[in-house]
Amino acid sequence: MLSGKLVRLIEVHQQEITDRLLRDIHRYPDLTHLRQLPEAELRERSQNLLENLGYWLVDGNEEEMARKYETLGKSRFDDGVPLHESVHALFLIKEKMIDFVGEQGFPPDVLELYAEEELERRVGRFFDLLVLRLVRGYEGAWRKVAYATA
């Protein structure tokens, strides 16, 4: 796995990436509900994801994080955070992570380019799973409320 060095780079610099994420959450006007959540909670979620990225990307381990994000979807519904804001936050984490790697100025050789491409593909699949499970949890909580009031 050529992207292992890049995954480790993300894990080591998770605090810097998280700081960038939190700045963006406060900058985007359409994330009003999300930015009202405690910053400590947002920071902890991001750092847990980033500092253990290598573990989460191993086959079989991603399901553990997916379950956590299904529970997070339910929590976000209960907190009144719109679904689009919750999904947007995941997109921002992925974007900040990939941007950080691209900014490191590695010499552009074929192996390094391949490693970055491999990382983007692996991270993309992982985040797709997280989004899917977040939405599933959110919809499950929404259905429960809808059926209770029907």
For each predicted feature, which ranges?
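Long, amphipathic alpha-helical coupling/dimerization segments that relay conformational signals between
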Residues: 2, 6, 65-150
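N-terminal low-complexity or simple alpha-helical regulatory segments
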Residues: 2-84
